[in-house]
Amino acid sequence: MEPTASGIFCNRMLSMVNSEDVNAIIQAQRHMLDRFEKTNEMLINFNGLSNVRLQQMNEHFLMHTRTLIEMKKDLDSIFRRIRALKGKVAKQYPEAFSNVSESSNLEDDDDEFDPIPASVATITTTATSEQSTESCDTSPDVISPTISCCSEDPSQEHTDTPTSDSHEQPVLRDEGPDSADI
């Protein structure tokens, strides 16, 4: 039989393709497929670990957020108590409290030069059972920087706390987040 044109064309096309090259290409594709499968498996493991870690961090974040919210509520409560105590002191000793308010306004003008006036730094006050029986106030708006707030009995005061025999009134300032300037 005489070869047909299509048969000749097919034979020449087949003879142009080198079987070694085809086998090398197939081998390279199998190698790449193995690498892609391993990479895919590693990425799946990484995603799983990342999701677990994200859940852990989310729980920690929520816990810390709740802690911050509770701390803010506690601080708001503390500042409310301080304002109530200031109001009580203002009602019990209106003359002294008005003098303190006037002197604090004058001292606010001098704060540029002396951040803590010497008269305020040497005043010592002790907390009484009328003021608080719950806990010590360690907030930044303490009446005086030298106050021993945990001491309810004067005999239990710290000996390193400076005292003064002067009859000056302590400066009461409310620096809480909800306070208005006096």
Swiss-Prot record:
Biased composition (Basic and acidic residues): 155-176
Low complexity: compositionally biased ranges: 124-135
Chief place of localization: membrane
Described function: As part of a BORC-like complex may play a role in lysosomes movement and localization at the cell periphery. Associated with the cytosolic face of lysosomes, this complex may couple lysosomes to microtubule plus-end-directed kinesin motor. May also be involved in the biogenesis of lysosome-related organelles such as melanosomes.
Protein name (record): KxDL motif-containing protein 1
Keywords on record: Lysosome, Membrane
Stretches the record annotates as Disordered: 124-182
